[in-house]
Regions:
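Conserved ABC ATPase "signature" region
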Residues: 176-194
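Conserved ABC ATPase signature
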Residues: 199-203, 207
Length: 394
């Protein structure tokens, strides 16, 4: 999905799904699924921050955990360090198979060959094919900082033990070397040596999040999933944490998957943004392109809610009607059609495919891929920002 040559890819997520089974009845039989993540693809490159945004319940946090295999996926793959040649082949194979990945009832010879090649690539690159020993080796390279700094740290452990635990688990260095490394990590996140001998409850929320960041850095990772790292903090403390994360990225070349519902923070931190709705990606683009010209009606509604720090400037607010459907019973066709101000008849019947709308800008919306483009009168406000959008790139 990310075609512009830049830094090498650390993780390539392809068609990942995570369904949580619903059980009911006398024998607790399987009666349905909660489709938390439903066919998501994205790339995270070296030294790059990818923002992942969407309303609460859209599947952002679940996706972050599935990518790192903290939660096992239902299907799909996360490829670690695929070469440019493998990346090109992956995209070609997935495109040839379509959304069903060749899982039709009567697979053709072509789809069978593609599936076989994908299986061979997955055996070499996919995290989900690694055994426990190989996954442990990768844990140090792929880390996560959790949203809640109050519950992510053990209350019974000293800071010295919390930050040093990854080093002990991976048998890194001698005891003295580990202690020295812990001290360096605390200094990198702005804490002092005397903090080594304190318990987490003795710190503020911002200080606890610094401890969580130090722990994630212990094994010198290549990528960190940041699961709303500032949402539980005061605004002044948020700025401090974001500055630390930016500095660490500049110094160490870290890749971030930055999960947040705070769009202004995502704009400041990210190079690319992925927008999710009800388990699906609806739009992905470079940050400047997404914020200057959002194409999907859902993205437009999200951005219209950002406050403007100028009382003389007004922006038309796009207010969505209705509630978010349940991921246990998503609507047919486009999942956003029940709330979309630009809905068309095709939207409730056919699920839109990702359409290229410019350099690295993709949108899943029938407004840009369907000949049926006559929107209802009430859609004028929602489409105002997309009227000058470029035509689809073939």
């Amino acid at each position: 999905m990310d075609s512009t040559p830049r830094h090498p890819v650390v993780l390539a997520v392809r068609n990942v799904r995570k369904y949580f089974p619903i059980r009911g009845g006398l024998f607790s039989s399987h009666v349905g699924d909660v489709r938390a993540v439903d066919g998501v693809s994205l790339d995270v490159r070296e030294s790059e921050t990818v923002g992942l945004v969407g309303e609460s319940g859209c599947g952002k946090t679940t996706l972050g955990r599935v990518i790192l295999r903290l939660v096992e996926p239902t299907s799909g793959h996360t490829y670690y360090r695929p070469t440019p040649e493998v990346m090109g082949r992956l995209d070609s194979l997935y495109a040839s198979l379509g959304d069903d990945n060749g899982s039709a009832h009567k697979p053709t010879a072509t789809s069978s060959a593609a599936l076989k090649e994908l299986d061979e690539i997955a055996a070499q690159y996919s995290l989900y094919r690694r055994n426990q020993r190989k996954m442990r080796e990768l844990r140090g390279r792929l880390q996560i900082v959790f949203q809640d700094p109050f519950s992510s740290l053990s209350p019974r452990m000293l800071v010295r033990e919390v930050v040093g635990e990854p080093l002990e688990i991976h048998h890194t260095g001698t005891r003295r070397e580990r202690d020295q490394r812990v001290l360096e990590l605390l200094q990198q996140v702005g804490l002092n040596p005397e903090h080594l001998w304190r318990f987490p409850h003795e710190f503020s929320g911002g200080q606890r999040q610094r401890i969580g960041i130090a722990r994630a850095l212990a094994l010198r990772p290549e990528m960190i999933v940041l699961d709303e790292p500032t949402s539980a903090l005061d605004v002044s403390v948020q700025a401090q944490i974001l500055n630390i994360l930016k500095r660490l990225q500049d110094e160490q070349g870290l890749a971030y998957l930055f999960i947040s519902h705070h769009l202004s923070v995502v704009r400041a931190m990210s190079r690319r943004v992925v927008v999710m709705y009800l388990g699906k990606v609806v739009e992905t683009a470079p940050t400047d392109g997404l914020f200057s010209r959002p194409l999907h009606p859902y993205t437009q509604a999200l951005l219209s809610a950002i406050p403007i720090p100028d009382p003389t400037t007004k922006r038309e607010r796009i207010v969505l009607s209705g509630d978010v459907p349940s991921p246990a019973a998503p609507p047919p066709g486009c999942r956003f059609h029940t709330r979309c101000p630009a809905v068309m008849p095709i939207c409730s019947k056919v699920e839109p495919e990702m359409t290229a709308m410019g350099l690295d800008h993709y949108v899943a919306c029938h407004l840009y891929s369907s000949p049926e483009k006559a929107a209802p009168k009430g859609a004028a406000g929602a489409l105002a920002m997309a009227e000058e959008a470029p035509r689809a790139v073939s």
